[in-house]
Amino acid sequence: MISPDPRPSPGLARWAESYEAKCERRQEIRESRRCRPNVTTCRQVGKTLRIQQREQLQRARLQQFFRRRNLELEEKGKAQHPQAREQGPSRRPGQVTVLKEPLSCARRISSPREQVTGTSSEVFPAQHPPPSGICRDLSDHLSSQAGGLPPQDTPIKKPPKHHRGTQTKAEGPTIKNDASQQTNYGVAVLDKEIIQLSDYLKEALQRELVLKQKMVILQDLLSTLIQASDSSWKGQLNEDKLKGKLRSLENQLYTCTQKYSPWGMKKVLLEMEDQKNSYEQKAKESLQKVLEEKMNAEQQLQSTQRSLALAEQKCEEWRSQYEALKEDWRTLGTQHRELESQLHVLQSKLQGADSRDLQMNQALRFLENEHQQLQAKIECLQGDRDLCSLDTQDLQDQLKRSEAEKLTLVTRVQQLQGLLQNQSLQLQEQEKLLTKKDQALPVWSPKSFPNEVEPEGTGKEKDWDLRDQLQKKTLQLQAKEKECRELHSELDNLSDEYLSCLRKLQHCREELNQSQQLPPRRQCGRWLPVLMVVIAAALAVFLANKDNLMI
């Protein structure tokens, strides 16, 4: 028997190994295959195709080169070799002979496909040779790429006169000088050189685009090659495994033939047939069980399908209900948001109302304190009013007394005036009598004169005394009249103050009643000026009363 390979299978090793180990393994495989001869049929076919492709590209580039420089080649027919066309171009008047420089330039410029294939062969020298099918695919792809290029033997047409470049000579006898342009640094550059540079740049851009396209194609081919190499490796590994199994079976058969005789082999075969029959019966029984289980499973599957259909219907119903509930939830969410916004607004209003309420409560407390102070002041004013009323009563009593005294004085003055008048009348009568006596007694005796003068002197003295008393009484009367006038003025002032205080008290009581009836929010604006006016009036009355009492 063949001993099994102790090494793990390459597939498992590839899955288990790391990236660095994989890179090292691939490098070792490349190094081991580099010395091996690399000559196969598919490589030779690819090489011929690449050579053909290279020649076609070179011819197409030469044609484009001649077209861009507005040169003309002689058409000798399709049967002639293209080298003869290159060696023998037609020379006409007005044309420039074609030099061998374009050909050398075209040969120097290596085709991008050749460069890329060279790099690919350098980068992947140790890869396993792909199968023939992959080579066919590559050959077909390259042939299709080559078919897209312009044909090989297309004749170069003569360009018209108005399309000729700066390298062609004019057909007429006149010779024109080449135009030139001056750069910023003072260097003169010919127009044809600028045109040549632009043509070279366009050609380089076109080559770059072609190279990019070829790189994309090569990347696609590389991915296909990698996949094909992986599949070929897997096939070879499977083939090696099968070969190993066949060898192990052959070894087992060989050992069995050496151990057992033909009769023993028959016995073993009979035993194996019995085992086979028993295994077949067991397999049939197991198959029947499996079929029964399958039937049960199918029945369960049908029942589950029915339940699934019912569940799907219910699911659709629940889905419709869910969508309806979702819409309701959205509407409720919008309503909830609106209510929350309203609630925030109301909370802000409530906070403002609370702050206002606090302010109003503070104002109300302040007003209550002021009300209490005003009530205390009103009580004080009422006491002052009572005192004022008592003072007025005293003053009225004094006024009555003064009026009574005035009346008594008036009566006495009248009496005194009557006495004075009577005395004046008596004096007049006495004077008349004296005049009559003087007329009746012509001789005047000096002895009797002093006796007569004495009564006259006594009468005059009495008159002067009466006059003095009368003047004193009149002065007293005038003083009493002044006092009465002053008392009348004071009484009028006190009555006016009393009436003003009564009016203010009534006004304060009315405002207090209104403040008790109206809400506190409306009273705040009206209370303050009224209270200030009442306080000012009460202070004025109080100060006036103090001044009067001091007087």
Curated annotation (Swiss-Prot):
Q: Which residues form a coiled coil?
A: 240-436, 464-506
This chain's function reads:
Adapter protein that plays essential roles in both innate and adaptive immunity. Plays a crucial role in the regulation of thymocyte development. Mechanistically, mediates TCR-stimulated activation through recruiting MAP2K1/MEK1 to the Golgi and, thereby, facilitating the interaction of MAP2K1/MEK1 with its activator BRAF.
Task: Respond yes or no to whether keyword Transmembrane is given for this record.
Answer: yes
Its transmembrane ranges are 527-544
A cellular component term (GO) from this record?
mitochondrion
Intracellular or extracellular location(s)? Cell membrane; Golgi apparatus membrane; Lysosome membrane; Mitochondrion outer membrane
Protein name, as recorded: TRAF3-interacting JNK-activating modulator
Q: Which InterPro entries match?
A: Cent_Immune-Sig_Mod (IPR051176)
Protein's UniProt keywords contain Coiled coil: yes
Q: Which residue stretches are annotated as topological domain Cytoplasmic?
A: 1-526
- SUPFAM superfamilies hit by this protein: Tropomyosin
Q: Which residues lie on this side of the membrane: Extracellular?
A: 545-551
Quaternary state and partners of this protein? Interacts (via its coiled-coil domain) with TRAF3 (via isoleucine zipper). Interacts with MAP2K1. Interacts with PPP2CA; this interaction targets PPP2CA to the lysosomes. Interacts with TLR4. Interacts with MAVS. Interacts with TBK1.
Q: Where is this region: Disordered?
A: 73-95, 140-178
Outcome of substituting residue 529 to S: In a colorectal cancer sample; somatic mutation
Q: Which GO terms describe its biological process?
A: cytoplasmic pattern recognition receptor signaling pathway; positive regulation of type I interferon production
Species: Homo sapiens (Human)
